[in-house]
A protein has these predicted regions:
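Substrate-binding cleft of carbohydrate-active enzyme catalytic domains
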Residues: 1-98
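Catalytic-core regions of glycoside hydrolase
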Residues: 69-188
C-alpha cells in the first residue's frame, strides 16, 4: 500500500472511476494499511500520497479499513490520529470529496469487547463515517443495535449491511426477498 500503483493498474482504476460515474455509481477507493503500519510520520505521508494519486485518477470517495487485524494496527487511538490527519490534510482541502469512511477493527457488536469504539467516539473527527455490520458479521440491522453502537461512536453508524453475503455458502447463489433491515433503524 505504500507504493504507487503501476501505470497499467492506475489506468485501469481511472477507467473504473469514469465508468462508475457514467452509471451513477459512487466509486469508493479503500486502503487497508493496518497489517503492517508503523504509525510514523513517513507512513502518514505514504497514505496521504496514495490518496493524492487516487484523487488525480478521479477518485472522490475514500475509505480506510482496519478490519480483520490484530496487534499494532488495531489501536483505536492510533487509527483515529491517522484518520484525523487525513481528514484535515486531504478531505477538507480537496474539492468535491465525499466524507471519509473508516472500517473499524471492531466492526460488529460480537467483537466489541473493549473500549475501542468509545475511544473512536471520543477522538475521531465527527465528520468521518464509521462502518458497522450489526450485532455480528452477518446480522439483521435493528434499532436496538444501532442505538448501542451510535452511543459509543458518538455518531450514526455507516451501515455495512452484509446481506446477502456468501462467505458461509460459496457454492450457492443467494436470491430472494430482503429481510432483516428494521425500518426504524435506518435513521437511528
Amino acid at each position: 500500500w505504500r507504493k504507487p500503483y503501476p501505470e497499467k493498474e492506475a489506468a485501469q482504476i481511472k477507467d473504473l472511476v469514469k465508468e462508475a460515474a457514467a452509471n451513477k455509481v459512487d466509486f469508493v477507493w479503500a486502503i487497508h494499511p493496518g497489517l503492517d503500519i508503523k504509525w510514523t510520520d513517513e507512513d502518514r505521508i505514504n497514505v496521504l500520497n496514495k490518496f493524492g494519486m487516487m484523487y488525480d485518477l478521479g477518485v472522490r470517495s475514500f475509505a480506510v479499513f482496519f478490519d480483520d487485524i490484530s496487534g499494532e494496527g488495531a489501536k483505536a487511538d492510533k487509527q483515529a490520529d491517522l484518520l484525523n490527519f487525513l481528514q484535515k490534510e486531504f478531505i477538507e482541502k480537496k474539492e468535491g470529496v465525499s466524507p471519509l469512511i473508516m472500517c473499524p477493527t471492531e466492526y460488529n457488536r460480537a467483537w466489541a469487547g473493549s473500549d475501542y469504539l468509545d475511544v473512536l467516539g471520543k477522538t475521531l473527527d465527527p465528520a468521518i463515517h464509521v462502518m458497522w455490520t450489526g450485532n455480528s458479521v452477518i446480522h439483521d440491522i435493528t434499532l436496538e443495535g444501532q442505538e448501542w453502537v451510535n452511543k459509543r461512536i458518538q455518531r450514526p453508524s455507516y451501515v455495512w449491511w452484509n446481506f446477502p453475503v456468501s462467505d458461509y455458502c460459496r457454492d450457492h447463489l443467494l436470491m430472494g426477498p430482503s429481510y432483516g433491515l428494521d425500518p426504524n433503524a435506518i435513521h437511528a
